[in-house]
Amino acid sequence: MAKITHFKGYSGPVTPSSIPKPSTPVDPIILTVQDGVPVVYPGCHALGVRVVHPANPKAPAKNMGLVMFYLPPHTINPPGSHETEETYVILEGSGTMTFANGRTTQVQKGMFVYLPPWCEHGIENTGTDNLVVLIATSPPNP
């Protein structure tokens, strides 16, 4: 494990916020996956659910997206790339991720995979159970 750090508040360049702070408290939005909006991906027999995303009227985030991605056994989401940053959190199952130049890595429950903008990536469920991935994007994918 990495060295433990202490949170010292938000740091970095001070820039004016593009989101003004409201004068009254903001309430959280509490959801389940069932509150999300299903999405299918071209060339893939998996299902995504946009839980926090501009496409979901129950949690219409503007600056991020959270998608639950369910990949059945022996299913592939083919490689592609996009402008958004993305992080895959492997919640269940195991598989193989493919990157540019044919590079591959095995993924399993508990792993995080950070994908910078334009990082080519694809994922295959090589296991016998569903591969369940929480995908965080910023900004959200269209």
What are these regions (language model features)?
Residues 101-117:
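Short acidic-glycine-tyrosine-enriched beta hairpin
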